[in-house]
Curated annotation (Swiss-Prot):
This is HEAT repeat-containing protein 6. It comes from Rattus norvegicus (Rat). The keyword Disulfide bond does not apply. Residues 365-417 are annotated as: Disordered. Residues 384-396 have a biased composition (Basic residues). The modification Phosphothreonine is found at T689. Pfam families: DUF4042. Coiled coil: none annotated. HEAT repeats lie at residues 230-269, 524-562, 586-624, 630-667. Keywords: Phosphoprotein, Repeat. The modification Phosphoserine is found at S471, S474, S714. The lineage of its organism: Eukaryota, Metazoa, Chordata, Craniata, Vertebrata. InterPro entries: ARM-like, ARM-type_fold, DUF4042, HEAT6.
Length: 1252
């Protein structure tokens, strides 16, 4: 006790007011014996212990003592000293702890409230024993027992006993923290009332311990504290006063902020803080982050204060689902987050405005001048081609340095598993862009990767952690420096974690307004580059912080394709101003440059993985088809060495990046060339990752006889067509090499192949190549077939699944080659006989077994999808037994109980029914129809949607078969089955839009297919009426536009059946009324177009019904022509010309069918709107519709012929006596032809036509 100031000790003795013997001194004076801080898992949610967060190597039995004198009573639980790794405790330990807890708890319960000296002495003793017990999470102590003990302890301690209140607060904090107990609501109410009263009544020196107890009580209990929130967070609430910037004690202020942060933690399924209290806490946290460090606060306390405020905001955004709807709130938060991101970063101190505003241009972020730091800034700059060795003394196990390598802050899971030795012995460095001065590469600091320097044209400068023996500081000062750096890094990590939560809580379109504040841009000549996330990635000495920054950047880039699509720099910019598209393109280029610099400079495998993932996100979203070449080439050449990295996560992410390259805007000519390059690494100097400098470095696949005979590979002796395909094949099927097996955590013990993630990623890259660059993949068709067979033979379902997906992509690529509009020349296609050979090998292999793998329904479904990707021409070339096998398997799987399998089977049957070799097989079509009708009754919407699509395909087959010369199919197809199909389609037309769109399509085809023999049967009459009513209601109702388009198309199909009583049936007027309503007023022009096309289908005047009906149709079409440009949606304007074309075609079609009684109504409309109609018909004759409109007449001769046919028909009509309408209409048409032929130089042709 000699170390204690005598005056203060005497003051404390006077405060206690009695004399005590030495053995009981520690129970009355504030000498507290505390157990060590909790482990990482136990400390969760208690950041006040973060400066003393122990590593797993700390002994659970170590005890630290802290003597509280005067204000020292506010000091936190002291950090325990590191010691040897503890041995595993015996299994009886938890029972022993439980017994000790029960024994002490029983003694405490036996005590009665008493103000005597002996009673206080006994309570002190019991509290000390309870605090010093060696608890561990899950130690057999029931939570309700802990809560009951704490309630009893508080009942025994009156609030006028400051020392006992301090001790019971320590007990609450210790037990709840160590045993991870969440207090139940009833006991929580009592304990909160007690602690709130204690803060109000006890001496200020006790507030620190009381606030720690309060933080432990409210942790994950915010929803149960509603009645106490006014006392805590009200205008004069305790936490608001104690956390105010004007509060005199910085430690108490920090503890109060920690309590607020814990209050903001939410528990899923429970109510959260009211919005008003959320806003109060948010504003308090924001004020703390905006306020500078006060003079009476030390740096570490300030760092912990910032951490707690950041954690509080993160909790509000994550669990509370707080929405930053006000621009001021979001801008203020982003401003403080950007400042906190760089807190304590060596050599950098930025000044930020109070609020950031959305703007496409970089905003001011001035830098305060900083003094050169020693010894970092005084380090010598080694040259680029010479390594300099640094002596690195093993550091003492300082508490602050340990904390740097602890769990990541918040949600950011960066650099997991980084060992302490790696962190303490590394020499940190990074390349930085030229505006920062110098650029550095990492120097070998004993990392496992053993990275050497890479030659670079940039000047090199290294940042490093200098051991205390090399610095001007003493060992103690060096330890404090390391501790300070650790806490500053934690603030930066906390800010990045909070920023990540902010990104997830706001819309991307809002976030991209702040793009320039966080994403780098190419600096103007002579101006410094603004600080950004890449500044942290390149300059932060902490690998964990670098990884956090990369994770935030990845979140920003994810889903940014639409935003980045405006970028363009394909031409040199020479304008007086910089367009936004050029600015975004410049930002994309700078991101590529900085990320590639970071890739070269990084020595931590975990951070390296984050860099590559971030690059993959950038590559997936950047519009390379609008950017100058070489960006992808640089990414490609930089990433190739990392494919052979020792760390499996780096290798997997490297393949992911290559997959992103080959899938972005495929096919790109630049990537096509890269795929054909030799397989060198693209580097001239050595690096930390082993790479291949020659093609011999790649694994070689032995070519079997079957491959030599069947493969389309280039002849022997020529260059490898695609090294990436060769790499992926070898990764999937060949045993791994020793050079890559050292750190393959996650690979199966004794496995001879690459780890599963690596093989799965290789299969995905092959699938991307097959989808985007099939011309290269087809060279390996048979070889890839062997890879697929090998994958499907493996026990790992994931490998099997990805093998089957690759098969589907290959099949789809083969189908695309043979489509009529394919750009692949016939001689460059894979021959049909080879495609048949490929599929025969698949069907002779494990594919049937995958189809029958009932224990893996996802695999079964994918196998069905693969089976549906057989080229139709190749299917007919398969042996009969293989064709029967495919059909039998699919029809059998349609009875599956699993909805995934059933949906895939229904779709596959819908594909097969279109095959030319199967569509005329009445038995197959009937079996398929029955299977589809059964699936239409399934409970799963997905199954019904696939079945409806297949039903539409099947009815398309019926229509195709109508055009064949042989009528046997129509005669043999069952009328009863046709009736069932109509009934099912009617029922499906009332289903969800996904089902309805194909159901109405099927209805139209079925009504078109009906033969006179069907229509004459009484049982069909009613079903025909119901079917047409279903179509009419779908046309008129406000359904999805695709559904209405299909319904109009179906009505047109119905009108094509001459056997139906169109014109005389009662439903005729309803059908025409629905179509004319749509053609005049539907918001979607594509639906209007389809309606106009349907109105021009009937081929006889009688099918249009009465004179009144014909007049209504004619008037509706004229009105549609008038309104063809009336739209508020600018996206519809591109369909205006097509709409006018179809309406003009319909009007001319009606003129070609009009009877004498129809002519007066036509003349009437021509009198009023003749000029408008004439101008649009002339425009139609001149240009027609665009070439992309399949329903329009494209030939000028055909368009002229339509007018001439109409004119000839009107001439032939026998006009009624005294009727002038015929002459007027003839004159109108002749005038149109005259004007058109004058403009096109066809006057002679016109005269011959008129003479006829």
């Amino acid at each position: 006790m000699s170390a204690l100031p005598g005056s203060k000790l005497s003051e404390r003795v006077r405060t206690v007011g009695w004399q005590i013997s030495r053995p009981y001194f520690c129970h009355f004076f504030p000498i507290r014996i505390t157990a060590p801080p909790a482990t990482c898992s136990a400390n969760k949610g208690f950041p006040e212990l973060e400066h003393a967060r122990p590593c797993p190597k700390r002994c659970p039995g170590s005890i630290s003592q802290a003597i509280h004198v005067g204000k020292m009573a506010a000091v936190q639980v002291a950090a325990s000293l590191p010691c040897e790794q503890p041995r595993e405790a015996p299994r009886e330990l938890s029972l022993e702890q439980n017994n000790g807890f029960r024994r002490l708890s029983a003694r405490l319960r036996a005590l009665q409230p008493d103000d005597s000296t002996v009673s206080r002495m006994e309570i002190h003793l019991l509290f000390d024993q309870l605090i010093s017990e060696n608890y561990c999470e899950g130690g057999g102590v029931a939570p309700e027992d802990v809560s009951a003990l704490l309630v009893r302890a508080c009942q025994l301690v009156p609030l006028n006993q400051n020392h006992l209140v301090s001790k019971v607060s320590q007990l609450i904090h210790r037990l709840l923290n160590r045993l991870q107990v969440i207090v139940d609501e009833q006991n929580l109410d009592f304990l909160l009332t007690y602690t709130i009263s204690a803060i109000q009544q006890c001496s200020p020196w006790t507030h620190m311990e009381i606030l720690q107890a309060l933080a432990a009580l409210v942790y994950c209990n915010g929803s149960k504290c509603q009645k106490h929130l006014p006392d805590l967070l009200g205008k004069s609430g305790l936490l608001m006063k104690l956390s105010d910037v004007t509060h005199s004690d910085p430690e108490v202020r920090r503890a109060a902020v920690h309590c607020m942060a814990n209050l903001c933690l939410s528990v899923p399924g429970q109510p959260y803080l009211e919005e008003s209290y959320q806003l109060v806490c948010f504003q308090a946290f924001l004020t703390i982050l905006q306020s500078p460090k006060s003079s009476d606060m030390d740096d570490i306390t300030f760092c912990m204060l910032l951490q707690n405020a950041l954690k509080g905001i993160q909790s509000l955004l994550n669990g509370g689902k707080m929405r930053l709807t006000q621009t001021e709130h979001l801008g203020a938060l982003l401003a403080v987050l950007k400042k906190a991101m760089f807190h304590g970063l060596p050599g950098l101190n930025i000044e930020m405005p109070a609020v950031l505003y959305p703007t496409p241009l970089p905003q001011y972020d001035g830098r305060s001048p900083v003094k050169p730091q020693q010894p970092e800034s005084s380090a010598a700059r080694p040259s680029a081609n010479k390594k300099k060795k640094y002596k690195v003394k093993p550091k003492k196990t300082q508490q602050g340095e340990k904390a740097e390598e602890e769990e990541p802050y918040g949600e950011v899971d960066a650099a997991p598993g980084l060992s302490m030795d790696q962190a303490n012995t590394c020499v940190e460095s990074a390349w930085c862009s030229s505006p920062w001065g110098s650029q550095g590469l990492p120097v070998d600091g004993g990392r496992a990767t053993g990275r050497e320097q890479v030659s670079s044209p940039f000047t090199i400068s290294s940042w490093k952690r200098v051991s205390s023996s090399e610095s001007d500081y003493s060992d103690a000062e060096g330890g404090m420096q390391g501790k300070m750096r650790s806490y500053q890094a934690k603030v930066r990590q906390g800010a990045l974690a909070c920023f990540l939560s902010t990104i997830k809580s706001i819309e991307k379109k809002v976030l991209y307004g702040y793009w320039s504040a966080f994403v780098p841009d190419t600096p103007e000549l002579g101006s410094p580059q603004s600080v950004s996330l890449m500044t942290l990635t390149l300059k932060d000495p902490s690998p964990k912080t670098r990884a956090c920054a990369l994770q935030v950047l990845s979140a920003i880039l994810e889903g940014s394709k639409q935003f980045l699509s405006v970028a363009e720099d394909t031409s040199d910019h020479k304008r007086a101003f910089t367009p936004f598209s050029v600015t975004i393109a410049s930002s994309i280029r700078e991101l590529h440059r900085c990320l590639l610099l970071a890739l070269v400079a990084e020595s931590s495998s975990q951070t390296l993985t984050q860099i590559i993932k971030c690059l993959a996100n950038l590559v997936s979203n950047a519009p390379y088809n609008r950017l100058k070449l070489s960006l992808l080439t640089k990414v490609w050449n930089h990433i190739k060495p990392y494919i052979r990295h020792k760390d499996v996560n780096v290798r997997v992410s490297s393949l992911t990046l290559l997959g992103a390259v080959v899938s972005t805007h495929a096919p790109l000519p630049e990537v096509q060339l890269l795929l054909q390059q030799p397989c060198s690494s693209g580097r001239s100097s050595s690096s930390a990752t082993p790479h291949l400098s020659t093609p011999d470095g790649w694994k070689a696949l032995p070519a079997g006889p079957s491959l030599e005979e069947a493969s389309l590979s280039s002849p022997k002796g020529t260059a490898e067509p695609c090294w990436l395909i060769r790499l992926c094949i070898s990764t999937v099927v060949l045993p791994k090499e020793d050079s890559c097996s050292g750190s393959d955590a996650g690979s199966a013990l004794g496995s001879t192949y690459e780890p599963s993630p690596m093989r799965l990623e290789a299969l995905q890259v092959l699938a991307h190549l097959a989808r985007g660059y099939f011309s290269m993949a087809q060279l390996y068709l048979m070889e890839l077939g062997e890879v697929i067979c090998k994958c499907m033979c493996e026990a790992n379902p994931s490998i099997q699944l990805h093998g089957v997906k690759l098969l589907e992509e290959l099949g789809t690529g083969l189908i695309q080659q043979y489509k009529p509009d394919s750009s692949t020349a016939p001689e460059q296609r894979v021959p049909v006989h080879m495609v048949a050979m490929f599929w025969t090998a698949m069907l002779n292999g494990p594919l049937p077994r995958a189809l029958q793998s009932t224990e893996h329904p996802t695999l079964q479904a994918s196998a069905c999808d693969a089976l549906s990707s057989i080229l139709p021409e190749a299917f007919s070339s398969l042996p009969n037994d293989k064709q029967i096998l495919c059909i039998t398997m699919l029809l059998g799987l349609n009875d599956s109980k699993n909805h995934l399998v059933k949906a895939a089977t229904s779709r596959a049957l819908g594909v097969y029914v279109l095959f030319p070799c199967l569509r005329q097989d009445v038995i197959f079509v009937a079996d398929t129809a029955n299977a589809i009708l059964m699936s239409l009754q399934d409970k799963s919407l997905n199954v019904r949607a696939k079945a409806a699509w297949s039903l539409g395909n099947l009815t398309d087959t019926l229509i195709v078969n109508m055009d064949t010369p042989d009528p046997s199919f129509q005669d043999e197809f069952s009328g009863l089955l046709l009736l069932k199909m109509l009934q099912s389609a009617i029922q499906a037309s009332t289903d969800k839009d996904k089902v309805k769109s194909n159901a109405v399509r099927a209805l139209g085809n079925l009504l078109h297919f009906l033969q006179p023999s069907h229509i004459e049967r009484p049982r069909f009459a009613e079903i025909i009426e119901e079917s047409i009513q279903a179509l009419i209601s779908t046309v008129v109702n406000e359904a999805a536009m695709k559904v209405r388009w299909n319904a109009c198309y179906a009505m047109g199909n119905v009108f094509k059946n001459p056997a139906l009583p169109l014109g005389t049936a009662p439903w005729t007027s309803q059908a025409y009324k629905a179509l004319t309503s749509v053609v005049m007023s539907c918001k979607n022009f594509k639906v209007r177009i389809r309606s106009a096309a349907a109105l021009s289908v009937p081929g006889r005047r009688a099918q249009y019904g009465s004179l009144e009906q014909f007049s209504q149709i004619w008037s509706a079409l004229v009105t549609a022509l008038q309104r063809s440009e009336d739209t508020t949606d600018f996206l519809e304007f591109k369909y205006c010309a097509s709409l006018r074309t179809h309406v003009c075609q319909a009007l001319l079609h009606l003129l070609g069918l009009a009877s004498a009684s129809d002519l007066p109504c036509i003349q009437e409309t021509l009198t009023v709107n003749g000029d408008m109609i004439r101008s649009y018909i002339l425009q139609f004759l001149k240009s027609g519709a665009g070439g992309d409109d399949p329903g329009a007449v494209h030939s000028p001769q055909e368009r002229n012929q339509m007018v001439r046919v109409a004119l000839r028909h009107i001439h032939s009509v026998q006009a009624l006596a005294g009727d002038t309408a015929k002459g007027a209409i003839v004159g109108f048409l002749e005038d149109i032809l005259t004007v058109h032929c004058d403009s096109s130089g066809e006057r002679a042709v016109l005269r011959g036509s008129l003479d006829q």
